[in-house]
Amino acid sequence: TAKRLQNYRKGQPDFYLEELYYQFGRYLLIASSRPGNMPANLQGIWHNNVDGPWRVDYHNNINIQMNYWPACSTNLYECTLPLIDFIRTLVKPGQKTAQAYFGTRGWTASISANIFGFTTPLESEEMAWNFNPMAGPWLATHVWEYYDYTRDKKFLKETGYDLIKSSAQFATDFLWRKPDGTYTAAPSTSPEHGPIDEGTTFVHAVIRE
């Protein structure tokens, strides 16, 4: 495999190597995200310390989302269920966060979360990475994606709809009307990509979705 990787870097086609990596990615998710357990965190389930990097928590600024991007599209619907169960535990504390920090309806989360329902920003003044009010709506897109692939109406009725609706309420209330009559999101930022601004692409994209 090392030789094949070396040749691949030189531009030699190797479709089997690509398939091997594809299946390896599926294996990692299968091994670290099974129904009835916690979802895959920053390191999946693989680290050799009592306290792993970044406290082995759940980073909602793209990390946990990236873990699950291939789940439904690679026919691993059941691997998404631990993530959805985890998101459900964030809703009630996330409602308090939405009201206390932003004065909105609905629920949201922030950059970091854990199994104890942590949804507020971290104790840091570095808002370029710590400020992420669209973490909740971004997580909610995974709930919709699960329904979009499975078309499980019972799931949508009993689990998905209320969670997504509450998240959409937060996103709607987060918008403010400008003097020209258009709506924008402010303050907003793209996680770990620059300062606080008005109407960043990331925030508007999540709200539209």
PLM regions: where:
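Extended ligand-binding clefts on enzyme/binding-domain cores
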Residues: 17, 56-78, 90-96, 193-209
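Acidic/polar, glycine-enriched structural segments that form the non-catalytic walls/loops
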Residues: 1-58, 77-98
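Alpha-helical scaffolds flanking conserved acidic
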Residues: 15-19, 157-162
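Short, hydrophobic/amphipathic alpha-helical packing segments
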Residues: 22, 26, 164-169
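The feature captures the catalytic groove of carbohydrate-active enzymes
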Residues: 41-57, 105-158, 166-209
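Alpha-helical support elements that line or immediately flank enzyme active sites
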Residues: 24, 28-31, 64-78, 133, ...
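Beta-lactam-recognizing serine transpeptidase/beta-lactamase-like catalytic domain environment
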Residues: 97-106
